[in-house]
Amino acid sequence: NLLLQTAVSAYARMTGVYKSYRRYGHPIAKMLETLLSAGIWGNERSLKYFDKLFGTQEYGLVFPKLIEYFEYTDKVAGIGQAHIVTTAFTTDELLLCRAEAFIYQKDYDRAVADIQAWCDTHASGTTVSRSAINQYYGSQATERTKKDLHPKFVIENGEQLNFVNCILHLRRIETVHEGLRWFDIKRYGIEVTHNISGG
């Protein structure tokens, strides 16, 4: 963690397993695209997030990334303010940004090194290689882990596109609940669908 920041927020409650807040949760369909997704590491059980999730399928599983800290202003009355601590900058996200820069320089070996460093801390027993990335994101990846891209710049088909899809997948996992996905959505023209619970 390079920079932590605090905020008065009920965000942890809004993304929890509460029926009234399920609109803002992370339902199982989205979990299968992020924290429970297959990838170059193999199946979802290889990701180190697998055993940190809890909750029900109906209201969404909870990944306790932003935990609430409650500060009592009056203990007798039981009132106070909810706080969260967020990580504004992490070395993990920085590695993925640098890997993306290497991809656009066509320095795939250095991109693989950064992706390997990320996988070392996020996935069990993963060995990353150019061929593994090209094989998975070139043919095995599904619409859950590989989105249609419509950028206003050129991405070469083949190896460069496969590496970009890999980075976007890893960044989506790394930055869940941080709002940084919107930068990727805008840059790459990824279509977003907002599903309403029960409709």
Predicted stretch roles:
Residues 1-20, 40-199:
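Acidic/polar-rich alpha-helix caps and helix-coil junctions
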Residues 27-32, 47:
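Residue-level signal for threonine
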Residues 34-37:
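Aromatic (Trp/Tyr) and acidic
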